[in-house]
Curated annotation (Swiss-Prot):
UniProt enzyme class: ligase
Name of the protein in its database record: Aspartate--tRNA ligase
Positions with a binding annotation for ATP: R217, D218, E219, Q226, E482, G534, L535, D536, R537
Catalytic reaction(s) noted: tRNA(Asp) + L-aspartate + ATP = L-aspartyl-tRNA(Asp) + AMP + diphosphate
CDD domains per the UniProt record, alphabetical: AspRS_core (cd00777), EcAspRS_like_N (cd04317)
A Gene Ontology biological process term: aspartyl-tRNA aminoacylation
ATP-binding keyword on record: yes
Principal location class: cytoplasm
Sequence similarity: Belongs to the class-II aminoacyl-tRNA synthetase family. Type 1 subfamily.
Organism: Vibrio cholerae serotype O1 (strain ATCC 39315 / El Tor Inaba N16961)
Annotated GO MF terms: aspartate-tRNA ligase activity; ATP binding; nucleic acid binding
Length: 591
């Protein structure tokens, strides 16, 4: 039906007759001529309809926005005075020779010329995707996927599919369950990742695997999470952690170079402990120059329990965050920051303004200055490298609360005050994570997943001191987002059982849930390691947006609902009966 895309017309085609299919973006009547801006996925071109072409002119008179049309015409150069440098096709226009209305359109429930509500955009997503901004994002996503396949194919990786109907495994979030009609009372789980299957593929001898795969997690959502998401899943045998990082870093660097013409450079490597100490986050945004600075040693003997208490507590921390130019902050703004850190458990936010460094104590403004000697204040200023016009904010609490509160405040202030370089790219690797952490109930949990290998420890050493163990894990971080994470895997049954034991999984549970894995580990399992990237998050960064819904064709809301199809919905009672399922809905307390 078409010979060219609208957005591909240029001066090299002048004089040629082309056939286009697309939509009416806009129609204008000017000086007896009708001008149509015709749009398809590749762009917009201006069409001119001359009244001398009576039949074509009559059809053009009927056109309205979003009519689907087919048009044949001659490409001609625009007069120099009418060249539109804002359009890719701005040097040419199309003189219409024939025009057909394929399908008419009702008035759209969306207005493409103004901002529509998120709810309306999701309800009519098929229309929202017609907008060039959205279309460009989906096309860039396709290019990213294509690049990944080409790169990994070239490097000897095999694209192998793994099951979607599988068994629930503990990976940190709730599973989406699928009832079995044949095995009544039993359920499949949709995979949170292909983790165990890709490890089994390594045991099968496929030493380089990849898959661009849908994964599912029933968890609380936010801007960069969806219940179903796409993962670039990678696993290798006989490669070290350093080699896995090298090949995947190369992939991301070449992707950015091809799609954005940006050279990310070599990725620095930072231990987890350093990231938490300096930035209060295991995914630090290095575009922001501010750092958390420890000052507990200076405050152990001050007559101010807010500082001296945590300073003398082995599990406590007192840290300072110097904000350049922050002395200009109003009391209202400081109060807003105080309320913000309270979200993370902080009980307050002490501050010290350096109004004039040369004026000594006269140039200092702080409600806590009376508790501190001049020597201590000068030592804090020197350590934080504060200058005239800066403000120093303090976090004093448990190490966890201080890191989370000041780490989050660092990001917030960096963005709001223009300190973060939003136009830069700052990648890094974070390595040497703790092997285990405590969950909200105080139970031991794997920081990554229970199949991650410890760093240079035997099973006996791991069991003797699990809280000090580091894992052979690594995360790729870009502009404050974790875009990929992986590890060297456990490749012998003894170590895997030791990890399960530490996690409180009984031998009986181990056999029930992971018997197939423990058995497989006994048959000459090769050392293996891998990594998975969140494709949605990568594309979000490539597109310069802050919400992964912007780069998914048909996303869910933060309530995990599809407004377009009204999913999820109630099931047919007959289908539930066939599955031997009875639905018991919780009733709200009327009291």
């Amino acid at each position: 039906m078409r010979s060219h895309y609208c957005g591909h017309l240029n001066k090299s085609l002048v004089g040629q007759t082309v056939e286009l299919c697309g939509w009416v973006n806009r129609r204008r009547d000017l000086g007896g001529l009708i001008f149509i801006d015709m749009r398809d996925r590749e762009g917009i071109v201006q069409v001119v309809v001359d009244p001398d072409m009576a039949d074509v002119f009559a059809v053009a008179n009927q056109l309205r926005s979003e009519f689907c049309i087919k048009l044949t015409g001659e490409v001609r150069a625009r007069p120099e005075s009418q060249v539109n440098k804002e359009m890719a096709t701005g040097e040419v226009e199309l003189l219409a020779r024939s025009l057909e209305i394929i399908n008419r359109s009702d008035v759209l429930p969306l207005d493409f010329n103004q901002k529509n509500s998120e709810e309306q955009r999701l309800k009519y997503r098929y229309l929202d995707l017609r907008r060039p901004e959205m279309s460009d994002r989906i096309k860039l996503r396709a290019k990213a996927s294509s690049f990944v396949r080409r790169f990994l194919d070239t490097h000897g990786f095999l694209d192998i599919e793994t099951p979607v109907l599988t068994k629930a495994t503990p990976e940190g979030a709730r599973d989406y369950l699928v009832p079995s009609r044949v095995h009544k009372g039993s359920f499949y789980a949709l995979p949170q990742s292909p983790q165990l299957f890709k490890q089994l593929l390594m045991m099968s001898g496929f030493d380089r695997y990849y898959q661009i795969v849908k994964c599912f997690r029933d968890e609380d959502l936010r801007a960069d999470r969806q219940p179903e998401f796409t993962q670039i899943d990678i696993e290798t045998s006989f490669m070290t952690a350093e080699q896995v990082r090298a090949v995947t870093e190369k992939m991301i660097r070449e992707m950015w170079l091809e799609l954005l013409n940006v050279d990310l450079g070599d990725f620095p490597i930072m231990p987890y402990s350093e990231a938490m100490r300096r930035f209060g986050s295991d995914k630090p945004d290095l575009r922001n120059p501010m750092e958390l600075v420890d000052v507990a040693d200076l405050l152990k003997d001050v007559d101010f329990k807010v500082f001296s208490g945590p300073a003398n507590d082995p599990k406590g921390r007192v840290a300072a965050l110097c904000i350049p130019g922050g002395a200009a902050l109003t009391r209202k703004q400081i109060d807003e920051y105080t309320a913000f850190v309270a979200i993370y458990g902080a009980k307050g936010l002490a501050w010290l303004k350096v109004n004039d460094l040369a004026a000594g104590m006269e140039g200092i403004q702080s409600p806590v200055a009376k508790f501190l000697t001049e020597e201590i204040i000068q030592a804090i200023i020197e350590r934080t490298q504060a200058q005239t016009g800066d403000i120093i904010l303090f976090g004093a609490d448990s190490a966890k609360v201080v890191a989370e509160a000041l780490g989050a405040l660092r990001l917030k202030a960096g963005k709001e005050l223009g300190i973060t370089n939003e136009s830069a790219w700052a990648p890094l690797w974070v390595v040497d994570f703790p092997m285990f952490e405590s969950d909200d109930e105080g139970n031991v949990a794997a920081m990554h997943h229970p199949f991650t290998s410890p760093l240079n420890l035997s099973p006996e050493q791991l069991k003797a001191n699990p809280e000090e163990a580091l894992s052979n894990a690594y995360d790729m971080v870009l502009n404050g987002y974790e875009v990929g994470g992986g590890s060297v895997r456990i490749h012998n049954a003894e170590m895997q059982s030791a990890v399960f034991d530490i996690l409180g999984i009984t031998p009986e549970e181990q056999r029930l849930k992971f018997g197939f894995l423990l058995d497989a580990l006994k048959f000459g399992t090769p050392p293996h390691a891998g990594l998975a990237f969140g494709l949605d998050r990568l594309v979000m960064l490539l597109c310069g947006t802050e919400n992964i819904r912007d780069v998914i064709a048909f996303p869910k809301t933060t309530a995990a609902a599809c407004l377009m199809t009204d999913a999820p919905s109630l099931a047919n009672p007959a289908a539930l009966e066939e599955l031997a399922i009875a639905v018991k809905l919780a009733t709200k307390d009327k009291a």
